[in-house]
């Protein structure tokens, strides 16, 4: 048989310190080899005894061969082993621990009560027996003694087989943390020479072999037993109690065994054999061998030291919020399937395959202490049935069997403080009560659609909040999506929503129309069929604040929940359409007639109706109720638009078509002539078809007095600018210019030429600036300049400037620029007084003659 010894975490060889406290003084290789040899001999003897057909209480499993598991680092064999915890390692451990125990009394029986604690994996009873074994180690030894011890252990294991497997899960830490604690305990309690002396004897070697075989089993319960932040407190409390109560030198090894990290093989047997469910001792029955030292039934009387150690070890476990009665329910994972739980049907124990246990929210330190899920002991396949007697033997130690191997003998503590729930926690029985009993408020339960996504971490927090506020009478478990998947209620009436979230939702909802929104929202909730609503809103009626918006909603994101009623949405859409249409109408009206609304079409027979009083035409004085008010953008942006409903006044259009009307003439005489021509009466007779030469418009070769006066005004305002004496005229040699006038009062413009011939001239730069305002091309302005500049001195006098202005005005009227300016134009531009012909009045001939005759 090949065997290998590794540490509990599978990383390397197990140190003697982590295996036992007795081997810490002599970690030699020969001792380990002897220990392995002793364990091998004990196990082979057990196989030979079972092959001979000896009557033992532990049956062989069907196909229960040991499969080596990588990662556990425990002793692996290819031969078959027994199922009820009686494998070779445990038999060797029990053989070494119980050989020299004295006849059982009430005190000794209480000392054998084993309770796994978070701070230590050893038991009080095994510690006492280990002390006694080491004290008598010098007088015993040999393989024959090991065979005798093995038979003795088989009898005790047969007598103390448990009638029911405890369902309490142990809270045992990993072996790595316990080994470090064992080193501290070995330093704090040094072994006496009496206890350290038999460590090299043959019995000590067998004890080391049993301990190594038991310690190499990976504690699967460490996956579930790791609790949040309570391990260090339990270890500290245990160390303080050991320091406060010193023991004599003969009991020093007993203290070391109490805190030893290596669980002895008798641990699992003693707890299962002596304790039933709830700490009640089970009565041994069935076939058993005649033992040389029969022991009476165990009692419930426990010594004071055992009770104190149990209280200190289960202090952290009591705060975890899990009682043993609640732990007996079915353990469900996320998918809802039942985890490994042995059930008795027809005298058979059915053990399903173990599954990996998953933690939620564990820290990094806890994940580092995880031990591989495959245990050291034999694991049964799924569906393997083990026949049992009336009193079933110990079931195979699987992953969940080791989880629930701890039982509290003391009265069950009350769990007050609850820690965060683990993923492997069983479902609350309250969930199943709602399946059989109808709900009081007749709420319809709808089968969940496949489109609904399983709740995330944020949604699980919402579930806890809804359970705490009491809005729902059903507790929703995190392990299952919903408990409504298994049934459909017979009630078909829609369930009303709670009023508390409705009021809270109405407070946050935007108040577009408060009355319509509050009324229609309640109606829409009642009228909405239950099949349309999201299932998450029924199981979690508490409102959830959306991160992006300021609104509360009941939806989980799978199906939309109407946050606003249909009436509110319709009102909002209509209001937006009206606002946009009104704004467009106002814009068009303001473009057509900025201050007035469009005029309705007039009636027939009232086309030429005129109001008698002009002050009545003002629309602001009309009654305001005659015409409805037109919506305005602001109060001050537009004038008041009120007036009578029917207005017969005709308003002049802003503009007419330019193709039907001639532009207004700039000259007054031309407009007057056109006006008189239009109102001239038509001739009744004469040449009807003859062309009237005088009626057509001609270009005139002279300017009117009105035109000349307008042009002279422009000349007067720009003459003499930028000119000095001697600019435009040649003076004689003895000519002296006049002194400039006195400008003490600031009445004279020094930029103009004073009294001199240059004062009546307009310089070329000024002429160009004035003529360029006509927007005629530069070449045409140059042609006009060449026609009027007769002196070629760079400046124009009064007559030249006036003729040039007239030519530009004629070009703007559409006439071409002539090649030569006529004499009539120059004469009309001269400043002269026209002669007036006054006719003498007509008189009677006689009277005139007589009168004249009388005068002369």
Curated annotation (Swiss-Prot):
One cellular-component annotation, GO: cytoplasm
Keywords from the named record: Lipid metabolism
Biased composition (Basic residues): 239-254, 603-620
GO biological process: lipid metabolic process
Biased composition (Low complexity): 12-42, 67-84, 111-130, 194-204, 517-535
Superkingdom of this protein's organism: Eukaryota
Pfam families from the UniProt entry: EH
Ranges of biased composition (kind: Basic and acidic residues): 152-162, 329-347, 503-514
Start-end of Polar residues biased regions: 255-275, 303-315, 396-410, 451-468, 478-488, 644-654
Lipid metabolism as UniProt keyword: yes
Family as reported in the entry's similarity comment: Belongs to the IRS4 family.
Protein name: Increased rDNA silencing protein 4
Organism: Neurospora crassa (strain ATCC 24698 / 74-OR23-1A / CBS 708.71 / DSM 1257 / FGSC 987)
């Amino acid at each position: 048989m090949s065997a290998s010894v590794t540490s509990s975490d599978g990383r390397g060889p197990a140190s003697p310190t982590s295996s036992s406290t007795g081997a810490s003084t002599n970690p030699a290789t020969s001792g380990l080899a002897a220990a392995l040899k002793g364990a091998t001999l004990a196990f082979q003897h057990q196989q030979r005894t079972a092959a001979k057909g000896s009557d033992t209480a532990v049956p062989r499993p069907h196909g229960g061969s040991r499969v080596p598991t990588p990662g556990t680092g425990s002793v692996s064999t290819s031969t078959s082993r027994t199922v009820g915890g009686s494998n070779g390692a445990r038999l060797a451990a029990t053989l070494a621990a119980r050989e020299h125990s004295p006849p059982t009394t009430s005190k000794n029986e209480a000392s054998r009560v084993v309770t796994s604690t978070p701070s230590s994996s050893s038991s009080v009873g095994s510690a006492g027996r280990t002390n006694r074994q080491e004290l008598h180690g010098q007088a015993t030894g040999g393989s024959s003694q090991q065979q005798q011890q093995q038979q003795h252990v088989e009898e005790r294991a047969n007598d103390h087989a448990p009638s029911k497997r405890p369902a309490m899960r142990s809270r045992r830490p990993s072996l790595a943390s316990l080994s470090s604690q064992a080193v501290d305990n070995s330093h704090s309690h040094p072994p006496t020479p009496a206890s350290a002396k038999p460590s090299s004897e043959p019995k000590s070697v067998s004890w080391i072999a049993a301990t190594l075989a038991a310690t190499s089993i990976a504690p699967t319960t460490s996956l579930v037993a790791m609790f949040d932040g309570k391990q260090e407190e339990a270890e500290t409390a245990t160390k303080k109690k050991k320091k406060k109560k010193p023991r004599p030198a003969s009991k020093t090894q007993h203290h070391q065994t109490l805190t030893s990290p290596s669980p002895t093989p008798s641990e699992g047997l003693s707890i299962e054999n002596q304790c039933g469910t709830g700490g009640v001792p089970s009565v041994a029955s069935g076939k058993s061998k005649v033992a040389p030292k029969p022991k009476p039934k165990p009692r419930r009387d426990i010594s004071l030291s055992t009770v104190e150690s149990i209280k200190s070890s289960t202090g952290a476990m009591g705060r975890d919020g899990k009682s043993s009665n609640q732990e007996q329910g079915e353990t469900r994972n996320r998918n809802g399937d039942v985890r490994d739980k042995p059930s008795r049907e027809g005298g058979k124990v059915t053990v399903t395959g173990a599954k990996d246990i998953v933690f939620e929210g564990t820290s990094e330190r806890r994940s580092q202490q995880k031990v591989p899920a495959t245990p050291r002991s034999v694991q049964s396949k799924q569906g393997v049935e083990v026949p049992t007697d009336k009193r079933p033997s110990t079931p195979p130690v699987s992953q969940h069997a080791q989880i629930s191997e701890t039982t509290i003998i003391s009265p069950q503590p009350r769990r007050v403080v609850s820690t965060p729930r683990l993923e492997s926690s069983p479902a609350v029985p309250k969930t199943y009560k709602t399946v059989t009993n109808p709900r009081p408020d007749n709420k319809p339960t709808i089968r969940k659609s496949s489109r609904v996504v399983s709740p995330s971490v944020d949604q699980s927090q919402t579930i806890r909040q809804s359970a705490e506020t009491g809005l729902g009478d059903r507790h929703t478990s995190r392990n299952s999506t919903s408990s409504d998947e298994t049934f459909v209620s017979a009630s078909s009436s829609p369930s009303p929503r709670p009023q508390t979230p409705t009021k809270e939702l109405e407070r946050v909802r935007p108040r577009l129309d408060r009355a319509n929104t509050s009324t229609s929202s309640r109606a829409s909730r009642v009228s909405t069929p239950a099949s349309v609503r999201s299932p998450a809103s029924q199981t979690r009626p508490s409102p959830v604040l959306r991160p992006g918006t300021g609104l509360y909603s009941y939806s989980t994101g799978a199906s939309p929940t109407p946050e606003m009623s249909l009436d509110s949405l319709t009102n909002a859409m209509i209001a937006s359409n009206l606002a946009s249409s009104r704004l467009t109408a106002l814009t068009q009206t303001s473009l057509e007639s900025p201050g007035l609304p469009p005029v309705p079409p007039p009636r027939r027979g009232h086309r030429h109706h005129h109001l008698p009083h002009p002050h009545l035409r003002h629309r602001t004085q009309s009654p305001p109720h005659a015409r409805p008010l037109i919506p305005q953008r602001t109060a001050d942006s537009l004038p008041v638009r009120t007036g009578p409903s029917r207005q017969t006044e005709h308003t002049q259009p802003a503009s007419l078509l330019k193709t039907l009307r001639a532009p207004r003439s700039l000259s007054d005489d031309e407009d007057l002539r056109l006006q008189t021509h239009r109102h001239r009466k038509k001739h009744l007779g004469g040449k009807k078809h003859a062309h009237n030469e005088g009626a057509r418009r001609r270009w005139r070769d002279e300017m009117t007095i009105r035109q000349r006066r307008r042009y002279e005004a422009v000349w007067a305002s720009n003459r003499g600018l930028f000119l000095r004496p001697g600019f435009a005229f040649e003076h004689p040699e003895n000519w002296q210019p006049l002194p400039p006038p006195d400008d003490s009062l600031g009445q004279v413009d020094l930029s103009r030429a004073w009294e001199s011939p240059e004062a009546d001239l307009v310089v070329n730069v000024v002429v160009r600036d004035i003529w360029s305002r006509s927007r005629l091309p530069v070449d045409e302005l140059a042609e006009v300049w060449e026609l009027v500049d007769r002196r070629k001195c760079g400046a124009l006098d009064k007559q030249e400037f006036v003729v040039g202005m007239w030519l530009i005005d004629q070009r703007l009227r559409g006439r071409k620029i002539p090649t030569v300016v006529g004499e009539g134009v120059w004469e009309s531009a001269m400043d002269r007084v026209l002669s007036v012909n006054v006719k003498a009045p007509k008189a009677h001939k006689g009277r005139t003659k007589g009168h004249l005759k009388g005068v002369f």
